[in-house]
Curated annotation (Swiss-Prot):
Component of the BCR(KLHL8) E3 ubiquitin ligase complex, at least composed of CUL3, KLHL8 and RBX1. Interacts with RAPSN. Residues 178-279 form the BACK domain. Substrate-specific adapter of a BCR (BTB-CUL3-RBX1) E3 ubiquitin ligase complex required for The BCR(KLHL8) ubiquitin ligase complex mediates ubiquitination and degradation of RAPSN. Pfam families: BACK, BTB, Kelch_1, Kelch_KLHDC2_KLHL20_DRC7. This is Kelch-like protein 8. It comes from Mus musculus. GO terms for biological process: protein ubiquitination; ubiquitin-dependent protein catabolic process. Residues 11-23 have a biased composition (Basic residues).
Length: 629
């Protein structure tokens, strides 16, 4: 017992000494912890003096060892038989990465205990490539192996590989193969690849239509393509031609799909001469009652546009242009926080939901009147920072240049422009001394201005639009206060007649037409910016309020694009705005869209009937880059 006690004391002394040595080492370890962490091995010390050592490098060794076992056929416990190919591997490794095998090996299935498992209806090379990926995390994709690999990855539920295959196939899309890839994706329920293929087909629609696969697409897929607003086309004629091409090649589908297919063509947007000279004479259209109804709808749309009465006419998706044919939204001039007017213009790409800078005007212009007529943009009057302007310039997308045109008789800012039957009307406005009731009419062909009957009330900062054979002047300021009154011009009578007034006084408001109604947006009630929006129906001579803007906007510019009203910039009482929002009349809701680059109010906004690709992007090098305050 004595000797045991003595040995115990010696042992305790040794442990105490060892503990002191360890504590010293522990302190050194703490000082070197950052260096240790920077290496592949990580160590930590807990409060109870325990020591945690983590070696990340070991995982690489582990991974490398597994790959070596596989390549050398060592310690394998299962062989996959795919056709004539035998693949020796490890159940545990397969179960870790491939959910299909995990479910198999953890179940009561007979295969769970078999050393040889036969897999039918797979490509042997594809399964072998997948197994190699399990061990190596590497996979080589080629145009030859990607489809069998995607099939195997989908069935075996290896989502990482399936996504990689989809992305690889996307990189190799071509007009001649995108429809076949889409059909392959649909057969394997790869929604992501289907969407990728559809997006590509829409972007390259006119090329895809010329390929052999086009007439072989399913009627359901054709329906989806033709209904898309994203079709990259120059004219709805191209969509009609594509539909007829497919229909003539697939008469077996006519009983169910003839009128359904033609209904996806936006016939109302076709020119009248094309409607009557081509569509109305097509035999398969003439012989189908529902197709004739669609043709009547298109005719009624054109009658409605010409202001002829059409009972029960309704706007539909077929009367809404597709994104590529909707025109380009221009934001022209205005001013920002510095007070200096802009000569810059910004153009909105509907597809990208973003703006880019187009060629600048010759003059700086704030509170400028802007309108688009026959595919050209006109900027009239305004103030250049030194004086009021009577000059006018025109932008032609074909030349990407602004050209000076005849000047108005009266120099003014805060004017509104409207076009009715060809001529452009310049309405109201003001200078430093006077609010004007003057109205001038510009004849585009002769490049001359003439005077027409003045309004009943002077209106500076007025809004205007042409609607059903009349030009409307909405709100404004008479030099004393903002106005709620509205009047309209009868060109045949050369006379202005007042109509029902708005519910809210406003000047510096935006005005646009949508679905046969007049919308007035924002503005100022004297100095107070407004978020309210009112709608006027000329058939009932009534105003009603619709959803308000997300923020007050005085000096806002508005225009209608693709069945929505866009409100651009303005001033909210504290700062100039670069935000843009769009109103959906179906949802009765405003939603923010892509902002302009420059905060600006008093800009002119209009939609030009041209293609975004026609406008030269001049980059961000504007002459007036300022903040919004």
């Amino acid at each position: 017992m004595a000797s045991e006690s003595t040995n115990g004391k010696q042992a305790r002394s040794h442990v105490t000494k060892g503990r002191r040595q360890y504590q010293h080492q522990h302190q050194q370890q703490q000082q070197q912890q950052q260096q240790v962490r920077s290496r592949s091995s990580v160590s930590e010390c807990d409060g109870d003096d325990s020591f945690i050592f983590e070696a990340n490098e070991a995982w690489k060794d582990f991974h490398g060892s597994l790959l070596g076992f596989y390549e050398n056929g060592e310690l394998c416990d299962v062989t996959l038989k795919v056709g004539s190919k035998l693949i020796s591997c490890h159940k545990l490794v397969l179960a870790c990465v491939i959910p299909y095998f995990r479910a198999m090996f953890l179940s009561e299935m007979s295969e769970a205990k078999q050393a040889l498992i036969e897999i039918r209806d797979f490509d042997g090379d594809a399964v072998e490539d997948l197994v190699k990926f399990v061990y190596s995390s590497r996979l080589t994709l080629t145009v030859d192996n990607v489809q069998p690999l995607l099939y195997a990855a989908c069935i075996l539920q290896v989502e990482l590989v399936a996504r990689a295959c989809c992305e690889y196939m996307q990189l190799h899309f071509h007009p001649s193969n995108c429809l076949a890839v889409r059909a392959f994706a649909e057969s394997h329920n790869r929604i992501d690849l289907m969407d990728m293929a559809d997006q590509y087909a829409c972007e390259h629609f006119t090329e895809v239509v010329e390929c052999e696969d086009f007439v072989s697409v399913s009627p359901q897929h054709l329906h989806k393509l033709l209904s898309s607003s994203d079709l990259n086309i120059d004219s709805e004629k191209q969509v009609y031609s594509a539909a007829i091409k497919w229909l003539l090649a697939n008469p077996q589908h006519h009983p169910k799909w003839l009128d359904e297919t033609l209904a996806q063509v936006r016939l109302p947007l076709l020119p009248v001469d094309f409607l009557m000279g081509v569509v109305a004479k097509e035999q398969i259209v003439k012989q189908n009652l529902k197709c004739r109804d669609l043709l009547d709808e298109a005719r009624n749309y054109h009658l409605h546009l010409s202001s002829k009465p059409v009972p029960d006419f309704e706007y539909t998706v077929r009367t809404t242009p597709r994104k590529h044919t909707a025109g380009v939204l221009f934001c022209v001039g205005g001013r920002g926080g510095s007070g200096d007017p802009f000569r810059s213009i910004e153009c909105y790409s509907i597809n990208k939901n973003s703006w880019f800078f187009g060629p600048e005007m010759n003059s700086r212009r704030r509170h400028v009147g802007v309108i688009s007529v026959e595919g050209k943009v006109y900027a009239v009057g305004g103030h250049d920072g030194n004086e009021h302007l009577g000059s006018m310039e025109m932008f032609d997308p074909l030349t990407n240049k602004w050209m000076m045109k005849a000047s108005m008789n009266t120099k003014r800012r805060g004017i509104a422009l409207a076009s009715l039957g060809g001529p452009i009307y310049a309405i109201g406005g003001l200078d430093d001394n006077t609010c004007f009731s003057d109205v001038e009419r510009y004849d585009i062909e002769s490049d001359q201005w003439s005077t027409v009957a003045p309004m009943n009330t002077p209106r500076g900062g007025v809004g205007s639009v042409a609607l059903i054979n009349h030009v409307y002047a909405v709100g404004g300021n008479d030099g004393v206060a903002s106005l709620s009154s509205v009047e309209r011009y009868h060109p045949h009578l050369d006379k202005w007649i007042e109509v029902k007034e708005m519910g809210q006084r406003r000047a510096g408001n935006g005005v646009s037409e949508l679905h046969g109604c007049l919308y007035v947006v924002g503005g100022f009630d004297d100095n107070s910016p407004l978020s309210s929006v009112e709608r006027y129906d000329p058939r009932s001579n009534k105003w009603d309020y619709v959803a308000a803007l997300t923020t007050p906007r005085g000096g806002v510019g508005i225009a209608t694009v693709m069945g929505k009203i866009f409100a651009v910039g303005g001033h909210n009482g504290n700062a100039y705005l670069n935000t843009v929002e769009a109103f959906d009349p179906v949802l009765n809701k405003w939603e923010l869209v892509g902002p302009v680059s420059h905060c600006r109010a008093g800009a002119g906004v209009a939609v030009c009937d041209c293609l975004t690709s026609q406008i030269r992007d001049v980059g961000h090098g504007s002459t007036n880059v300022v903040d919004c305050m």
